[in-house]
Amino acid sequence: MTDPALRRLTTAQTVTLAVMGAIYWFVAALVVRWTAANWVGSDGPTALVFALIIVATVPALFLGMAVAHIDRDQAQISAAIMTGTALLLDGMALTWGQSLYGSNPAIVLGGAASIMWGAGVAIVLGMLLERRA
């Protein structure tokens, strides 16, 4: 049997994870657009949203790994690929398409911060969820 530490993702798995990251980013961007005016700038609601992001990220990681047929021994790299894709798209949207998030600069900033928070959460959860040999 191959040592899990030596296993590499296939091209199909990598592409699947990148697509899942793009889907998650797009859903997050739409959630920001539709809801951020209700919580950006308010400490209590913002803290609640950040907590909900943690809760939502766990099943999102497991779903992405399931779709790509990846076991927990590769959770960290899976989280990194999905998150990296989402952050690349977020950076492009913030540079060239801020209106995706809304027209109010404070909402755009708060929404982008929530997406970056989600990316950090995903990376940490990927490390914590990875099954070690």
Locations of regions flagged by a protein language model:
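Juxtamembrane/disordered regions of integral membrane proteins
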Residues: 1-133
